[in-house]
């Protein structure tokens, strides 16, 4: 375990990569998540911080994705079951829609699952599945976003790239409808 700057219990020793834990944002606790993205960020920040502890880590969500048989599966943070196992009062919304407007020459379905904390509506995790590359959408929980934040957040709209309400907006709106806030 290190501090937020990568220092071990000896302030002259910095630790990065698969040798250490990282602050896991969904649970606000240290967790062992051996991913290359974490190792690269930790190593870079440790190199910077050796010269004066100036840049804390932002934590991680355990975001990953894979392409299988022409489909993208992406995930970040907690699944619903992992949230319950962690003792979090959570719920989820499952939402499916096209990623582009129907009038476009081609479109494809995106299935989204958003896991959220019931009281605060904070997004704890998400999973996405589509033929369309949805891998970067899994980064939506880094900033402690809530269903309310994501329901109407400004997203790029141009019919080639998406709908007036992005699939993330629509999934968050579905979650708010599920709990009677929309």
Language model region names:
Residues 5-6, 65, 104:
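Short secondary-structure boundary/capping segments
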Residues 46-53, 174, 178:
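C-terminal alpha-helix
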Residues 21, 29-34, 48-77, 150-158:
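Active-site-proximal substrate-binding core of FAD-dependent oxidoreductases
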Residues 71-76, 86-182:
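Flexible, glycine-rich terminal cap/loop adjacent to redox cofactors
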Residues 8, 41-42, 59-61, 109:
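Short gly/pro-enriched beta-turn/loop segments at secondary-structure junctions
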Residues 1-45, 137-143:
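FAD-site-proximal beta/loop scaffold in flavoenzymes
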